[in-house]
């Protein structure tokens, strides 16, 4: 059964949709500035800025050199349950041949498998 809150016209969808411009801008910025694994310094800074704007409770940096972990505390601490979400941030050593305003500004590097999108959405 489908919950009406999750339909394209539902409340949850409308709430998430209000962030579309910011998420699109972040994804395009990450796409334009690709970095190989363990070199994601710019990406890490941008992700940290976005997490701070979201008001996460804690941000731990330097995980696996360039990774981050954000802690969001739920309203109820009684269950002890936790959920972990993750996204890769690295790009690939591939030349980008797309021609749009947010194409890679780094010769021979691009986000070719969606890590920019995964990072922005998470």
Name what the model sees in each region:
Residues 2-111, 120:
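Acidic/His- and Gly-rich active-site-bordering loop/insert found
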């Amino acid at each position: 059964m489908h919950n009406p809150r999750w339909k394209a016209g539902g409340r949850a969808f409308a709430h998430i949709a209000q962030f579309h411009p910011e998420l699109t801008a972040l994804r395009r910025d990450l796409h334009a500035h690709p970095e190989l694994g363990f070199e994601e310094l710019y990406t890490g800074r941008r992700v940290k800025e976005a997490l701070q704007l979201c008001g996460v409770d804690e941000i731990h940096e330097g995980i696996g050199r360039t990774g981050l972990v954000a802690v969001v505390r739920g309203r109820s601490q009684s269950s002890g349950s936790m959920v972990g979400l993750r996204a890769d941030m690295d790009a690939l050593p591939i030349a980008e041949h797309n021609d749009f305003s947010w194409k890679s500004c780094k010769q021979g590097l691009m986000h070719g498998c969606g890590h920019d999108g995964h990072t922005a959405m998470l």
